[in-house]
Amino acid sequence: GDGMSTPQIYAAMLASDSPTSFERFPVSGLVKTNSKSHKITDSAAGGTAIATGHKTNNGMIGMNSDSIAVPSMLEIFSEKGMKTGLVVTSYITHATPASFVAKNINRNNYEEIALDISQCDNVNLLIGGGRKHFTDRKDGRNLIDEMTYNGWKYHDTLINSTENNEKVLILAAEEHLPTSAERGDFLPGATSFAL
């Protein structure tokens, strides 16, 4: 997680009657995600550290502490000809996933972040929630329609397949997706689709 540490992981392992997902990982690593401005990070600064390798101030996404945009690993991979994507169960505009595809000084600028995402040309697949930030906007724009016009294929639920070169946007909820107990096999299905 973007701000989680080993004590939280170990506590979950102790509380669980069965092995946690973390115990099934073949390898593990640690990254220091404290923010530039605070000893305790938030999802924006933590997500930016993971996505870009740059520390930033709490609340900022996709840019360094001097408010200068920095490339995320998705941008770097895309420039090398690789396909990229994000699969999340939160808003796609939420701080952690947004750190991979948007640049903003305030993690709560959801409509601006959605606009950044809609204009992002270095990602091929976006799956998550947060549809309202693309459609129910103060500026009256429908970013899903704009993305569709620009070649994206939009769906509001998981699909079985797509053409290899299509850009796909799946926003399966107005806000966050339901809890893991309520959403069933959405995440494994979305992950399989992405791969």
Describe the residue ranges of each PLM region.
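N-terminal catalytic scaffold of extracellular/periplasmic and nuclease hydrolases
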Residues: 1-137, 141-161, 166-167, 185
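Anion-binding catalytic surfaces of enzymes that hydrolyze or transfer phosphate/sulfate esters
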Residues: 158-195
